[in-house]
Amino acid sequence: MDAAWRGGVGCSPVCLDLCVGLSPVREPSAARHELLDRPAGCRGGGDSKSMTNDEAKILEAKVTQMSEENRRLTEVIARLYGGQIARLGLDGSASPPRPVSPLSGKKRSRESMETANSCDANSNRHQGGDADHAESFAADDGTCRRIKVSRVCRRIDPSDTSLVVKDGYQWRKYGQKVTRDNPSPRAYFRCAFAPSCPVKKKVQRSAEDSSLLVATYEGEHNHPHPSPRAGELPAAVGGAGGSLPCSISINSSGPTITLDLTKNGGAVQVVEAAHPPPPPDLKEVCREVASPEFRTALVEQMASALTSDPKFTGALAAAILQKLPEF
């Protein structure tokens, strides 16, 4: 019976080989050849756990497709990072790129494109900054904002070394230094409302004219203009020395008259005092009016006013002609 068992049939009626699928490490072609080389009785044609030829072909096609995708992604990465590798002096053939998944390859390509765009934007900004001297740009939270720069010149006494320009705002000095192109030092001021107000001011004498003070303002005030204090120049006063309001008292008993000389065109504005003087005594007023000196002065004033008016002469002549009898 042992002899019949050994020689009667080509293989054992019970196949002891267990095939649960392809190993992820083994090549699909090798697994396929192994399945084909097995005896017919050991293939388990009806068993659901065995691998058929159709399933092997499908797996082989998937592996080929993934290999092709990896090859294309490797070429894209090589094109994107080829310039950086050449600048660093590295040899790409020494260390071949590792296979990456499609998701990671797309993410890297998107990041590299964003990096290239940011570099181009920075280079264009640096090139344009050399041509524009009146305005500067500052990056804040990923956005570019325009900073207003203005310059004001004031005529001062050459012996004055205070480097103070009175413009109506309050400033705090935080530094001073000497520059190469000007022997006069440059003073740095910050608005008194800082840090809420970002305006800064630089004051320095002109290198050509020592009596000219140049003030450079950076930024715009985000608060209303404070009221000018007594004795300070207004912000919009023109001219070399400016002008100040003055109070003139004509006499001790009369009203106080304020002359505002800061108006354009030399106009003078008369402003009466807020508190009027006490009313005069009626008896004294009546005595002054009844005096002959007052009457003489009144007649002279009226005569001078009438004779100075060119229309008065014509009206007087017309009235006289109407009263004359007709000849």
Curated annotation (Swiss-Prot):
Instruction: Enumerate the UniProt keywords alphabetically.
Output: Coiled coil, DNA-binding, Nucleus, Transcription, Transcription regulation
Any one Gene Ontology BP term:
response to fungus
InterPro entries on file: WRKY_dom, WRKY_dom_sf, WRKY_plant
Q: Which residues form a coiled coil?
A: 56-76
Annotated segments matching region Disordered: 88-134
Regulation: induction:
Induced by biotic elicitors (e.g. fungal chitin oligosaccharide). Induced by pathogen infection (e.g. M.grisea and X.oryzae pv. oryzae (Xoo)). Accumulates after treatment with benzothiadiazole (BTH) and salicylic acid (SA).
Residue intervals annotated as DNA-binding region are 160-226
User: Where this protein primarily resides, as one coarse class?
Assistant: nucleus
Q: Does the keyword section mention Metal-binding? A: no
List where in the cell it is found: Nucleus
Question: Which spans does this entry mark as compositional bias, Polar residues?
Answer: 114-126
This protein's GO CC annotations:
nucleus
Per the record, what about its domains? The WRKY domain is required to bind DNA.
The record's family statement is: Belongs to the WRKY group II-a family.
Q: What is this protein called?
A: WRKY transcription factor WRKY76
Q: Which organism is it from?
A: Oryza sativa subsp. indica (Rice)
Q: Which gene encodes it?
A: WRKY76
